[in-house]
Amino acid sequence: MLPTLNERVVELAVRTGMALNCEVHQESKFDRKQYFYGDLPKGYQISQYDLPLCFDGAVDIPSDDPDIGGGGTKRIGIIRAHLEEDTGKLGHELPGGGSYAGSLVDLNRAGTPLLEIVTEPDFDRVEDVLVFARELRSICRFLGVTQGVMQKGHMRFEPNINLVIDTTDGREFRTPVVEIKNLNSFRAVEGAIRYEQSRQLEEFLETGRTMGLGMKRTRGWDDQKLVTVLQREKEDAHDYRYFPEPDLPPVEMDVEWRE
């Protein structure tokens, strides 16, 4: 069965992008993002690479960050908002809460439309991350894009975290970036970020590892143990071997429809 795109999905994505003060590409397209993982049995994901629907936006959030004087606003840049298909879900628990040594694959949500919003790295406080996350959920709820029930997976957050460490001799080091996948509660977002701050500092002091090509990792959040756990090494974008999706035509929007 070939993939199809419905107009309603594009409408909701563009509506969200405009609410985030994004520019909207008049012509957009889809691409195949190729990688191997248990939740993606076909070996590629339909996504958008170089021509996302929406790009270059910003959201102002209230912030008590002392670096901006406290009690002001902080601008969070939006790099892009693009459509892609959702993947499956890997589980490691049995009904009733028992643990399972392997992985249970749930493909019920695979192929459903997903809007991914990517921010600039404008956060340096976990408090601002939480304010932004709640603001984003409020915007999407108001627009009717989602019910925003976190426990049902309506919204998931995937923070990318690393530290900038200044040493006493005046040098600056940046730890490798870690992406925490599929956080479905604000408590999990806060817990994962705070844990990673401590873990990455400890790792740097032990190993001296710093940011570099191919050093990015993907970790998950264990809600029971309150720790992050390694899931896989994260490939760089060029390793995904993006190429235009042959089974979906480009998306062209005229000005009247957009307005």
Give the role of each language-model region:
Residues 1-259:
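Basic, nucleic-acid-interacting segments
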